[in-house]
Amino acid sequence: PKYVIRMAGETAKPGWIANVNPFVVFCCVSFVTRIMAKRSAITSMNIGMFLIPVSAMLMACGNIFESELITGISNITVMMILGIVVQALAECFISPRYLEYFSLQAPKGEEGLYLGFSHLHSFLSSIFGFGIAGVLLTKYCPDPVLFETHEAWQAASANAHYIWYYFAAIGLVAAFALLLFAKIT
């Protein structure tokens, strides 16, 4: 929310933007699951994992365009919504098959333990993700109240889109790591 409000202005509605993800998942998960039914869980997950960096790169494009793509809506908002749509589609490929994949990795009788540990990534990513996001936000998109003029803040936040490059890189590394893991196991 801070990125959107700082870059798109106080009139931005990050709460509304956050509703895009569940809406897209609700509308698309059954369709994607049906399409991927004959494919392996790892194939479906890999497709989703490679969509994640695409999502981040779309979000980075928000302040690249000179004029508004849609009249009356900030490009930051438009590209954020497009990025969230792609991220939600990635979730449609990953989530339905994620627990299936972990249960198939488990030795007989230890499925519950493996399924429990399958959520460890959520814990770790929330800690590291929020920490990294805070550091990057401070570096590339600082709070405007810390500056004497709007021009000084604009100069300090000129590269705010770099934040998304970091997350695209992390997503790409994770996607290749999953491919490598699938080949090894």
What would you call each of these model-derived segments?
Residues K2-F26, I47, V78-I81, A158-Y165:
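Loop-to-transmembrane helix entry
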Residues V4, C92-P107:
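Intracellular juxtamembrane helix-capping segments at the cytosolic ends
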Residues T11-A12, T77-V78, S103-H121, A160:
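Loop-to-transmembrane helix entry/capping segments in MFS-fold secondary transporters
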Residues C27-I47:
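Helix-to-loop junctions at the C-terminal end of transmembrane segments
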Residues F50-G72:
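C-terminal ends and interior cores of transmembrane alpha-helices
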Residues C61-N63, S157-T185:
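Multi-pass alpha-helical transporter architecture, strongest
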Residues L69-I94:
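Hydrophobic core of transmembrane alpha-helices in multi-pass small-molecule transporters
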Residues V135-G171:
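A membrane-interface helix-boundary motif in multi-pass transporters
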